[in-house]
Each structure stands twice: as structure tokens, then as C-alpha cells.
């Protein structure tokens, strides 16, 4: 398995080099109708062993400054490509850092906070998700990627929300 090449219709591209590939993708496939971005949550997690929590314990009262470069790259991609819908997903600990750039999140689904432009997702209230489900061994170099999968139920909710969305243009 080289990277995530085993995932159908997946390309592994460097988000920091988006200027090198975004135009080719738009030419090949057209403007995407939807973009989902999930910057790595480690920097923003409130978990005890995460950098943010460690910083707070070691530097009480001092502001934590996470690396926002991936979020900025995603913002640039969305501004350049202008998809009809997009979601930027992260954990609750990202909220104080994302909100100044993206505004408030539009929906919270369990532990997922969603920012962007998308209809509200209809996810069953009894749905549950744990990042530890089918958790690969810690020696797996792709562990973080595999744990970061967007759950199928969320993906299905996005498809349904977008498919059933009626725009004002469609009424005219």
C-alpha cells in the first residue's frame, strides 16, 4: 500500500502546493461541487497528551498559537476553486482558532464541528462514532490517516443534504 492509493478515486496531493495542481484538476474534472477538508486535529485537540493541553499546563495564562498553515491553504483553495458547497471539519478545540477565520461552525455532529457552506446534515441522533473503532496498531505509519477517515454516515448525510438542496436559482 503506497499512501492511500488503495482508496478508490483518491489522489494524494500536497495542500501547500495547491497552486501546482488545482488548475489541472479543475480542467480535468471541472469545478468541484463539494470540497471536504479535515486539517489534522492534533494541534487543536483538548486531549491531555495533545500539544494544546500540554502547552496550557506548561505555560499557564499564555495564549496557544497552533500552526494554522493548513487551514489557510484550504481557505485559499476554496477561494480559488469556489465550490458550491464545502465543509471544513475539526474538533471542538479548534473552534477558538478557526472561528476568527471562518465564522462560527454551522453544525456540530457528535465530536465533529463543521464550518463552511453546506446544508445542515441529517444524522440520526442515535448514531455514534469513535476514532478508536478499528484502530490500527500504533506502528502503522498511516495510523493518523486511517483514524481520520470521514465516517460513512457523515459522507452519506452530506450527499443527501446537497442532493436535496433547492437553490433560489432553481426556483427562477
Language model features: what each stretch is:
Residues 1-172:
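Conserved active-site and SAM-binding loop architecture
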Amino acid at each position: 500500500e503506497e499512501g492511500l492509493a488503495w482508496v478508490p478515486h483518491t489522489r494524494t496531493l500536497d495542500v501547500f502546493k495547491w497552486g501546482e495542481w488545482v488548475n489541472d484538476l479543475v480542467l480535468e474534472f471541472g469545478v468541484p461541487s463539494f470540497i471536504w477538508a479535515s486539517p489534522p486535529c492534533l494541534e487543536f485537540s483538548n486531549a491531555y497528551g495533545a500539544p494544546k493541553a500540554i502547552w496550557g499546563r506548561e505555560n499557564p495564562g499564555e495564549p496557544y498559537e497552533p500552526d494554522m498553515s493548513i487551514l489557510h491553504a484550504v481557505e485559499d483553495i476554496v477561494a480559488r476553486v469556489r465550490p458550491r458547497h464545502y465543509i471544513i471539519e475539526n474538533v471542538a478545540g479548534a473552534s477558538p482558532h478557526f472561528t476568527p477565520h471562518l465564522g462560527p461552525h454551522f453544525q456540530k455532529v457528535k465530536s465533529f464541528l463543521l464550518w463552511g457552506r453546506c446544508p445542515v446534515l441529517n444524522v440520526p441522533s442515535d448514531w455514534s462514532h469513535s476514532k478508536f473503532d478499528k484502530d490500527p496498531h500504533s506502528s502503522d505509519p498511516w495510523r493518523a490517516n486511517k483514524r481520520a477517515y470521514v465516517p460513512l454516515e457523515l459522507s452519506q448525510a452530506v450527499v443527501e443534504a446537497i442532493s436535496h438542496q433547492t437553490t433560489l436559482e432553481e426556483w427562477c
